[in-house]
Curated annotation (Swiss-Prot):
Lineage, opening ranks: Bacteria, Pseudomonadati, Pseudomonadota, Gammaproteobacteria, Enterobacterales
PANTHER family in the record: PECTATE LYASE (EUROFUNG) (PTHR40088), PECTATE LYASE PEL9 (PTHR40088:SF1)
Organism: Dickeya chrysanthemi
Protein name in UniProt: Pectate lyase L
Annotated signal peptide: 1-25
Name of the encoding gene: pelL
Family membership: Belongs to the polysaccharide lyase 9 family.
Length: 425
């Protein structure tokens, strides 16, 4: 199942027209663009100058000049390439997005021609500076597409604003979490984005997650079609977050492995950490996959609220599903149509059925076309969606086909939903 621009209103979903040309495309396999029109384009290149007018790539502005000039409904169009942010030892070099777009008229920042604009903050491997985020998004209604943030001195992106969208973005090799939402950030959408190899030297890997909608994050934050792998701590970390987070069609794998030769390494290694600190967070995760994580694939982590867990697959984690902690009175987890393979599942205080460890059929390797987990890191499809491979797809004669329970908002093609993250068509 593809998640192309999921969660986003129709007007924004296909992205935007740019003077009826094809410098941007909703689907990079075609030259077509559709959606809404921008009021103004600011052309930006790595060698751009504040003295240029930014009317074309022949006279590109600098990124900072374009940010200062851009208004709601306007586009900062980035020439693909590397935008190097100078590093000075002991000092931060954050880019702050503190102005705001408007509902229906965000400020767009996007790479041209389906390319990638890489913002390299240049921090050496062992160096970090407190709060030296790469992107610090305090404003509202920004729309980022085709952007990468790497080697930031702390979080790759730290989001406290609201109604922002990150599409087909990547956050990697930063000195803390790839993308974190905190301190009131609400109604942010992260779609078809990757976070990998983030590590915090400050605390020996115990803080750097892939994606972190945590603590004081506000309501309405959603993730779809995202991957988080080989981060020093967790893939997705919803620690101490009472506001509901929705995660769909996302993958978390090989988190918590010491790739940094840190003799004091302290990463946790959960795929999806779905709570913490006894906060009551009624999060929802569907159609997602966890494998090869050091600790747990799907982790309650002392969430005192009931979590909804539907049609997920967990394989060869330390523990596949860890939901053994108590919840507050009146709270209960909801588990349906999940698969656990080559690992244990502990699910207490739950309304649970049609899972492979309870009333559903027991899963085995023969139920799947492939368990080759190297397929998880191949390139995304041209439209930015996760690659459609044989990994964890059900085999023709799998006993997991049509073995699930019908659920609202869970589509299926047979007489009933299949078990696991991927419906066999």
């Amino acid at each position: 199942m593809k998640y192309l621009n999921c969660f986003i209103s129709t007007g924004l979903a296909a992205f935007f027209l740019v003077n009826s040309t094809s410098v941007l495309a909703a689907d990079c396999s075609s030259d077509l663009t559709s959606g809404i029109s921008t009021k103004r384009i600011y052309y930006v290149a790595p060698n751009g100058s504040s003295s240029n007018n930014g009317n074309s790539f022949n006279s590109p502005m600098s990124f900072t000049a374009a940010m200062a000039a851009a208004n709601p409904g306007e586009l900062i169009l980035l020439k693909p390439g590397t935008y190097t942010i100078p590093y000075t030892q002991g000092k931060g070099n954050t880019i702050t997005f503190n102005k705001s777009g408007k509902e229906g008229s965000p400020i767009y920042v996007a790479a041209a021609n389906c390319g990638r604009a890489v913002f390299d903050f240049s921090f050496p491997d062992s160096q970090w500076v407190q709060a030296s985020y790469g992107f610090y998004v305090t404003g509202d209604y920004w729309y980022f597409k085709g952007i990468e943030v790497t080697r930031a001195g702390y979080q790759g992106a730290y989001v406290t604003g609201s109604h922002n969208t990150f599409e087909n973005t990547a956050f990697h090799h930063n000195r803390n979490t790839g993308l974190e939402i905190n301190n009131g950030g609400s109604y942010n959408t992260v779609i078809n984005s990757d976070a990998y190899r983030n590590y915090d030297p400050k605390k020996n890997g115990s803080m750097a997650d892939g994606f972190g909608p945590k603590q004081k994050q506000g309501q309405g934050n959603r993730f779809g079609g995202c991957r988080a792998w080989e981060n020093s701590d967790d893939g997705f970390d919803l620690f101490d977050s009472p506001q509901k987070v929705v995660i769909e069609n996302s993958w978390a794998f090989r988190n918590g492995i010491n790739y940094w030769s840190d003799s004091s390494f302290a990463g946790n290694g959960n795929g999806f950490k779905l709570g913490g600190n006894q906060a009551v967070g009624n999060h929802r995760i569907t159609r997602s996959v966890a494998f090869g994580n050091v600790s747990k694939g799907f982790d309650q982590n002392n969430n005192a609220g009931g979590v909804t867990v539907i049609n997920n697959t967990s394989y060869k984690n330390g523990i596949n599903y860890g939901f053994g902690s108590n919840v507050k009175s009146g709270q209960k987890h909801y588990f349906r149509n999940n698969v656990s393979l080559s690992g244990s599942a502990t699910v207490n205080n739950a309304d649970a059925k049609s899972n492979s460890w309870d009333t559903g059929p027991v899963a085995s390797a023969s139920d799947f076309v492939s368990l080759d987990t190297s397929l998880a890191t191949i390139s995304r499809d041209n439209d930015g969606t996760l690659p459609e491979t044989a990994l964890f797809r059900l085999s023709t004669n799998s006993k997991l086909i049509n073995a699930g329970t019908k659920e609202s908002n869970i589509s299926y093609s047979g007489s009933a939903p299949d078990l696991g993250a991927f419906e066999r068509n």
